[in-house]
């Protein structure tokens, strides 16, 4: 790939404009631009510099900083295509967002890290924070993954668990959740205990079937290699040589969280995931996830990975919905505080 030096267009104006060009290897142009130029359009929407493509040459013009960002974006996207990974508008958006956010990391390195491959489908991190989260799982025995819905915290943890089993780093996978959800308590639901708990574990089953051969899963579950169970079934056990994922951990009590973490045995790894803004515990009880992070985050070999709305990898509207609700709840909290202060002032008169 050839880069031609930038040249000043209007050096006398208050805001200098520059131009530059990059020659893309001819065999990579189609992959870079995408079907019907969909990748180019996604790139143009995210960049302030003007982009023009002629043959295998990409020309840029605009403010120096904008052109520099566009040049680096093209270079990183070309590297992704050259590595053999498919480039999509979603990958373009995540790559440019990464450059805008920090500029210190290579999107090509982050977005081409394969965690798990199955039947042509690849699981890989799509944001810088997801990459840091995955790296933390590799480097630590216990990792807390905290973030809103759609940030991939559970899916990536399960992908790492399946990979660890396939590469014989562990001999079994244990997936667990507390059986508490908004608006429902198990005692009021019909059916046996197993029938009551199963719907709460369904998201874990869904992810598992997405990552492994469906016909293999029942055999692995019947032999105990894979276990999907309510958190209550963890009590009194020591879990050796296992990859253990606790999902929806914000709905554990402090006692449950302590019980769970002390199940850790030799050769095991634990990933705890949750969203501290979605606590469904009755009576305003303090979340065991919050307590655990406060108590344990300074301990070596325990890592707290925080993901945010910028890491949401579902439909683009999901991140906007997450931000809108956070803003509304912050405003609502401020209004309630103001009302309490006003009420207190009246009572003191």
UniProtKB/Swiss-Prot annotation:
ATP binds at residues 147-154. Keywords: ATP-binding, Cytoplasm, Nucleotide-binding. Pfam families: PhoH. It comes from the Bacteria. GO terms for cellular component: cytosol. GO terms for molecular function: ATP binding; RNA binding. The keyword Ubl conjugation does not apply. The keyword Nucleotide-binding applies. InterPro entries: KH_dom, KH_dom_type_1_sf, P-loop_NTPase, PhoH, PhoH2-like. It is found in: Cytoplasm. PANTHER family: PHOH-LIKE PROTEIN (PTHR30473:SF1), PROTEIN PHOH (PTHR30473). This is PhoH-like protein. It comes from Mycobacterium leprae (strain TN).
């Amino acid at each position: 790939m050839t880069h031609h030096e930038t040249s000043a267009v209007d050096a006398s104006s208050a805001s200098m404009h520059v131009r530059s060009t990059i020659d893309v290897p001819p065999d990579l142009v189609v992959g870079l631009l995408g079907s019907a130029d969909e990748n180019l359009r996604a790139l143009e929407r995210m960049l302030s510099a003007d982009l023009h493509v002629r043959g295998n040459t990409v020309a840029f013009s605009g403010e120096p900083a904008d052109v520099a960002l566009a040049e680096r974006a093209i270079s990183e996207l070309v590297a992704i295509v050259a590595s053999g990974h498919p480039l999509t508008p979603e990958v373009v958006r995540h790559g440019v967002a990464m450059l805008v956010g920090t500029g210190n990391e290579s999107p090509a390195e982050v977005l081409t890290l394969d965690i798990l491959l199955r039947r042509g489908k690849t699981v890989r991190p799509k944001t810088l924070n997801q990459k840091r989260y995955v790296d933390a799982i590799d480097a630590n025995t216990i990792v807390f993954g905290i973030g809103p819905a759609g940030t991939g915290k559970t899916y990536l943890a399960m992908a790492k668990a399946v990979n660890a089993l396939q590469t014989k780093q562990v001999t079994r996978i244990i997936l667990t959740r507390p059986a508490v959800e908004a608006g429902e308590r198990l005692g009021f639901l019909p059916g046996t205990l197993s029938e009551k708990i199963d719907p709460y574990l369904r998201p874990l089953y869904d992810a598992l079937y997405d990552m492994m051969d469906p016909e293999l899963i029942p055999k692995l579950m019947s032999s105990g290699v894979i276990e999907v169970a309510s958190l209550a079934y963890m009590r009194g056990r020591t879990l050796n040589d296992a990859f253990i994922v606790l999902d929806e951990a914000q709905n554990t009590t402090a006692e449950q969280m302590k019980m769970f973490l002390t199940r850790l045995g030799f050769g095991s790894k634990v990933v705890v995931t949750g969203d501290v803004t979605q606590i469904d515990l009755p009576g305003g009880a303090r979340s065991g996830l919050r307590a655990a992070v406060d108590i344990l985050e300074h301990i070596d070999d325990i890592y707290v990975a925080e993901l945010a709305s910028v890491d949401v990898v579902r439909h683009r509207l999901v991140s906007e919905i997450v931000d809108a609700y956070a803003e509304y709840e912050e405003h609502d909290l401020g209004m309630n505080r103001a009302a309490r202060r006003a009420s207190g002032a009246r009572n003191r008169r």
